Structures are given as C-alpha cells and as structure tokens.
UniProtKB/Swiss-Prot annotation:
Disruption phenotype: Semi-lethal in homozygotes and heterozygotes with adult escapers showing abdominal planar cell polarity defects and also extensive wing planar cell polarity defects, both proximally and in a distal region between the third and fourth longitudinal veins. Greatly reduced accumulation of dachs at the apical cell cortex. The gene is app. It comes from Drosophila melanogaster. It is found in: Endoplasmic reticulum membrane; Apical cell membrane. The DHHC domain is required for palmitoyltransferase activity. GO terms for molecular function: protein-cysteine S-palmitoyltransferase activity. Detected in embryo, imaginal disks and pupal wings (at protein level). Enriched in the somatic musculature and gut throughout embryonic development. Interacts with Dlish (via N-terminus including SH3 domain 1); this leads to palmitoylation of Dlish by app. Interacts with ft; this is likely to interfere with the interaction between app and Dlish, reducing the ability of app to palmitoylate Dlish and tether it to the apical cell cortex. This is Palmitoyltransferase app. The keyword Transit peptide does not apply. Residues 387-401 have a biased composition (Gly residues). The active site is at C177. Its main location: endoplasmic reticulum. It is a multi-pass membrane protein.
Amino acid sequence: MNLLCCCCCSNMAPNQRVTRKWELFAGRNKFYCDGLLMSAPHTGVFYLTCILITGTSALFFAFDCPFLADSINPAIPIVGAVLYFFTMSSLLRTTFTDPGVIPRASNDEAAYIEKQIEVPNSLNSPTYRPPPRTKEVLVKGQTVKLKYCFTCKIFRPPRASHCSLCDNCVDRFDHHCPWVGNCVGKRNYRFFYLFLVSLAFLAVFIFSCSVTHLVLLMKKEHEVFNVIKAAPFTVIVVFICFFSIWSVIGLAGFHTYLTTSDQTTNEDLKGSFSSKGGPRTQNPYSRGNICLNCCHILCGPMTPSLIDRRGIATDEFIQQMQHQSSPRHALSDVLSASHMVTTSQPMMGGLGGGGIGGAGGGISIGGAELKPRFYDESNPSSSTLEGNGGAINGHGNGHGNGFDHPPPSYDLVQNGNSNSLAQLVDNEIPLVQMDIPAYTHQTATQARQYRHRHHKQRQICNGGTVSYENQLANASSEDELDDPDVVVVGSPEVVAAVAAIASNKAREMRNRSGSYSNLFDADFEAALVNSSLADNHVRGEGASSSGKPSAGAALLAAAISGKTENMYSNVLPVDNDTDPADSTLHVYSNIIDERKQQEQANNVLSSTLLCDDLDLDDPVSASCHVKRKSLGDGAEQVKSAERLRMLHDNTMIDTALDLDSLDGSSMGNNSQSCLVKSGKPNATSVTTNVAIV
C-alpha cells in the first residue's frame, strides 16, 4: 500500500504557485483572504470606529444590562445584542465588499477608444481643436454626458466617478467614507445605509438605557457624587453616546432622503438634480415613487463584481498589467543611459558646434558622450558653475554653455507682477546662448567665481538725441579682460548689488509725489570717481595696492545710487538700428528704448515748464544740459563743474530766478529741473535750466 502511494506521488506534477489577478490589481485597494475581501488602502479610521462601537457596547452590557434586566425587563440585553449584531455586520459588509469597481481598459481597448475620439488630419487643420472627451447618451429621454477617465482609459458609465484615494472608477459612486474604510458605491450602498440606521438605533437605545440607569440610582442615592461613584462607567457611556448620537442621526436622515429620491451624495453636492446650479432638472434615475426607490436601492438584485479578483493571471495578463503600472517614455532609454540628476530648477543647455545641451537634464547629443549636469543649491558660486566642472556646460564639438537659475526670490513669490529689478533677474529665463570663454584664474578663490556680464550704456550727445551702445565682451584671454564692459565680480557682491537695486527701485516708487524733493537728483557717482580711473578700466576682484576700488565695490555703490541698470546675465545688446518691435528680441531688450523715451520726455517737459512759468522781463533763455558720463570721465566732470561755477558768478542765477512765479504744476513727478544752487561743484550729473538776463 505504501509503495502504491509513493508511485502515485512520483507521477504527480510539482506544486507550482498560482498567481491571482488581485495580486496584480492596478488600484490601491487592499485584499484579504486570497482576494475574497477588499478594502480601501487606509483603514486606520475604520479600526477606530470598531473600537468605539465595541467598547461602548461592552461597557453597556457589563454595567447597565444586569441592573436594567433586574429592575425593568430581562429583554433589554437581547435587544441590545441584536442591534449590535446588525450594526457590526453591516459595517464589516460595507468595508470588505467590492463597492462596484469598474475594471480598466486593456491596451487594445484603450487604443480603440483613442482612435474613436481622434480627429483625422487634425494637426494639419488650421481650426484644430482637441478631441472631445465626453459622450452623450439618452436616459429616459434626457441627455447624460459620459466623461472619459484618463487613468482607467474608459468612458465612465452614468453616475460613476473616479475615487482618487482608491484610484478606481466606481459605479454609482456615492462618496469615500473613511469611517467604514471603503468607497460607497452601487454594490455596498445598501449595507452602508443599514449600518447608519442600525447604529442610530443602537446609540439611541444605549443612551436611553444608561440615562434610565442613572435616574434610578438618583432615586436611591439622592446625591450626584454618590451616583457617579456607584456607576462611573455608565457616566462614560452617556457622554460617548450624547456626543455621537446627533451626527449619526443626522447622517442617517440625510441618506434616507437620498434613498427616497434615488440620488447619491456626489450628485446632491453638485446639484445635478436640484436648483442649486441653475434650473431644476428632473432626475432620470428616479422611479417616481418613494417606495419604489427604496425597494430598488435596498432590496433590488445585487449586481456581480466586475473584477475577477480570484482569477488566475495568465502571462498575457501579467504583461499587460506590468505595462499599465510602469509605462515607459520614448526617451527613457536615453535618459537612463545619461545617469542624469534632475532638478526642479530651469536649466539651459548650450548649442555648440556639434552638441546640443538638453534643457533640464543635461544631455548632450551630437558628437559628445552623455554627460550629467548638477545644480548646487547650497553654493551658487561653487566650482560647479565654472570651467571643467561640467555643471553648466553641455558641449559637443564646440563650446556650449548653459545657466542654472537659483530658486525664485521672495519678492517673486509674493508679488508675481512686480516690476522690481530683483524679480526680473530671478525671473529671467535663458532664451539664447551666451559664449563664456574659459579663463583660468590664478588663485583658488578666483576659480570659484563666475563672470557676471555688466552691460553699460554709453550715452553720446548728438544734437539732443541719445544713442546707446550695448557692448558684450567675449574675453578669450587675460589681456581681453581689460574691456571696461566686462567686470569679474563674486557671487555675494552680485547678490548685494541686486538687492540694492531692488531697494532703490522701491524708494523711487515711494518718492513719486508732488513734493520738492523730486526736483533734486542726488548723484552718488562723484564719490566713486578717482583720478586713477580716467581711462575707465576696471581690473581684478579686489582693491590693488595702488588704491583702486574693486569691481564689486564699484558695482555695489553704483547699485545703491540707482545708476546701475541692465544687470542681466544674458540680455542681448540692442543697437539703435534694431527694430524694437522685432519679436525675436529678448523679452527685456526693450527696457533701454523705454528709458530713452522717458528721459527725452522729461527733458522736454522740464524745459517747457521752466520757460512757461518764469516771469522775467524779456529774458534770453538758455539751457545748459550736461549728460551723465561714465565713472572714468573725470576730466569732463571737472570741466562741467568749472563751467557751472563760472555761469553762477557771471549771471547771478540766484537773483534772476523768480521762484514765487512758478506754478504748482511744474513740481510734478516728471520734473527734473534743478532750480537751487548745488552745494557740491564736482557733481557728475547736473541738469540745470538757467535764464540769462
């Protein structure tokens, strides 16, 4: 006999583990008992509900039922047990029952649906519109829209909705209830309603019985403290039931209304069949009778589950579910080969002779191997921004450079429409390539600094017109760094200069009023002028032994005075012959044109108001207009100061001007007339209108 058993066992196939479909389910639901039971992914509140109901009932059965059975009726414990049984069975059935999950479309079904909603030759049509994602069906003569679910790749049936917590489309979706730990839908709504009703009855029953117990004790003890000492757990049960009974009864009443009208919580909140969202529409799903609606919802046939949870997963099904759970992009192989580190900061890859720097990922394609790029948020001036670090350089056979942008400033976050210069620098999106030739600094400190492009505008007086020349130096050697338009500064100095510019802009906005303070132009450049800077050459990072001010100090001082402008890292130079309306220009390249127009308008307005308001006897008006020069024009500034002193001594400006005859309108915001004698003859920028008698 034993030999026969051994032979039979040897002929049997080896035991292989069978994969069920619930193990590969695409949603977030939890499954128990080999797929027989399912619930929501988060069931912590459900366990709290069970503890509250079970604990309160246990206290009632242990301390109240014996006294009430002897004093009133022995059937009280039986009624309480029946209500507790109905409540817990309805709760468990609601939690572990499939609410009506609609299975997702397979790959072939999704492709077929996409083909149906696709518009032929849509990309070539000038009136192209995205394909519609809704369908219309008739339900009892009323049009109902079917919405397309992008997650499940299906057109949802009427009254269905997608639960974001469970990540499934549920038929006749009512709501997601964390107290029961599951969605409430078509297949478990009846159990949910029975749970609410039975819980309401149980709470009312326990509360009334506990209060009765306390009242009977009061008749014997005649003191509240003695009653509390005699039945402390009864007092706890009364408090729990008192604070929970109102919400339970209200929720049960609300769902009774929904059941009698054949509506869902989702439809009631949206006002689909009420006058909340407009004219009242008739509910096409109602049977027209309260009893029929209740019988259909609570006593109607229960539809089978649409998901085959315990079915055996075939190889085709496994491949399909793996494809749905982890879709791959067309460039996923390229991205994985580059081992890139993605950041949330915008980046720009340079375009060189044979390479293209990818935006955001640091991929260089065309002649060079794939290379990662990084952004060092902790140290913007670190060596990863310079030279051979490869942090911002996405290069092929040529030189291609990119810029990493730091996180947006607080001013940008708080005021998105702010016009401050700090926001423009932070909000600047690199649209073009800027070639920064490699330059090896001699010290380690200089190697950790990057070149900041400081665009200076040279103003040339040509018959009253102002022409601007923006120069961008592409230094390729140490000798070419003598260009006055290229300043090598450190990152902290740039940040300080930008902050000073922002403060200066805010101060100008506050000073725009009709006060006399707007008539003066306190020019701060005189403090920065040195006789050793006559050739307007700025060299090095710090002050040299000869006493030359550092480029960072000059930049910061000019920023504080409000004379520094166009401090952008990649703003293209704008010439006079460039059309300002050209759409290919940089987004900030029209700032110079606006400033030019504003300054010309100010000059015209100032001279006009002065000539109209001065009450002089046949004066010969003359205007001495000295334009602002650069920092290095020391000789011109001295000449201008001497001319002003000579003009003051010869023409008696103080007695010739009748300040009382000036109209108040000349004190406007745009007036820049200097009508008071300047105390500093060496001012670098003076705009004065005089009348020679």
